Amino acid sequence: MTIAYNPLNDPLWRIENLYHIVDKYGCKSLFKLNWAQKELYNNMWYCNVILKARQLGISTFVCLLFLDRCLFNPNMAAGIIAHTREDAEQLFKRIKLAYDNIPNSVRKEIPATNDSARELVFSNGSSIRVGTSMRGSTLNFLHISEFGKICAKYPDKAEEILTGSLNTVAPGQYVFIESTAEGKSGAFYDICKKAEKQPKDALTKLDFRFHFFPWWKEPTYRVGSIVPFPEEINTYFDHLEGSGIKIDLEQKCWYALKAQTQMDNMMREYPSTSDESWMSAIDGSYYSKQMNLCRLENRIAFVPYDDTVPVHTAWDLGYNDSTAIIFFQLVGKEIHIIEAIEGSGESLVHWLGVVKSKPYIYDKHIAPHDILAHEYSTGMSRQDSARKLGLSFIPSPRVEILPGIDAVRSVLSRCWFDEKKTAGLVKALENYTKEWDDKRACWRSSPLHNQYSHYADAMRYLCISLGIVEPKTYNPGTLGGLRSSPFGR
């Protein structure tokens, strides 16, 4: 006996034949999977993390996927989280448009019994809702949109999503986390990097599968007009082709034109590789542009200790907080940062012991200017206390924070960082940002005080104190640098 084929039993057929969207040109049209959506559909796992270029329709696809699963499966609950209420409402409009335009015969079979501004509840017991959090729900499907932005601007909300919303989804149900990159820190970065390293054939139901969708796979990202390329973009294309990515002239022209408006954000908004996506300037970041240049010029590498040149230290001394110490040498006009350490809960005596235990020949030790302040308990300044223990601090000049940040920006072009021994410092400088103002939805002018502040402060003291520690004269013939040595090549 032959059973008649019913296309409504085919999830892929339903996705491409029942639902309408408003496309990027503002026209209502029947939804059809593009290459990225099809690749995600064919390769999706229980837990999925998606790093992508802009305008590939990933959020739209996941919204329609969840709507379809709720319509054709009873007692399913789907939740969609966006980083702002306005964005959540926009995602819900896509779902509502798709539901309102399915064939009447289908909608009559599965009517919406509750149709509000943020939730659809269907007669089969399934529901789909949107918001900025899903704590307290029990979900079968969860989509977190632009999680990178949430991590960058709303770290408390990101933590709540991790501990609350993600825990509403049982193993074996479905999670989709997608975003463009927002710097080398935060939960989105950590989830992506861990998932990227995982063998895809050895994943458990709790492991995330990594998906990456670059700009150059999108067939519409090309122009027919020939445009001139700046030299740096030509060099970039050569680098891509050297790594096996082949792009044609029309794609190159599109990229060059797009880069004119996106500028430093191009690698974030339209990455070619997953590694590249993390290199773009972070919104609100003070030093990401300068640190990216350090990487491009290979100034984050092996930086050896030169025992013919003295070592200086720059400190951020916390009273009830972390202490950070940077060890650096001045070699010609280069600043070689050979080591950086940080910790909390230890006394000044402990840190002096750590510094003395290093095999370095020291010259000057820079500390914050408030090291001269006297403590009520002892009547002594911490400069006096350190001197009694055998280490003489020099207070840094009294410079306001923002001019000090400008000093760091101007000095970073001279800096070389040891890749292993200063990894924490490099990460801090790449992720040191302004504070986000939730009420005004903009960046404040002041820095965010978080785990990256201590190294960033120590670096600021280093840079504003160079006039104290730099040699009064320097002879490039006798003091070279890594640019002219085998280590810097």
Role assignments for model-derived ranges:
Residues 90-141:
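Inter-Walker segment of RecA-like/P-loop motor cores
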Residues 48, 91, 96, 184-203, ...:
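Mg2+-dependent endonuclease catalytic cores in nucleic-acid-processing enzymes, primarily RNase H-like
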Residues 109, 149-249:
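ASCE P-loop NTPase helicase motor core
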Residues 76-97:
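Conserved Walker A/P-loop ATP-binding site and its immediately adjacent core
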Residues 306-330:
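Gly/Thr-rich phosphate-binding beta-strand-loop-beta motif of the actin/hexokinase/Hsp70
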Residues 45-66:
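Walker A/P-loop
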Residues 1-47:
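Pre-P-loop entry segment of helicase/translocase ATPase cores
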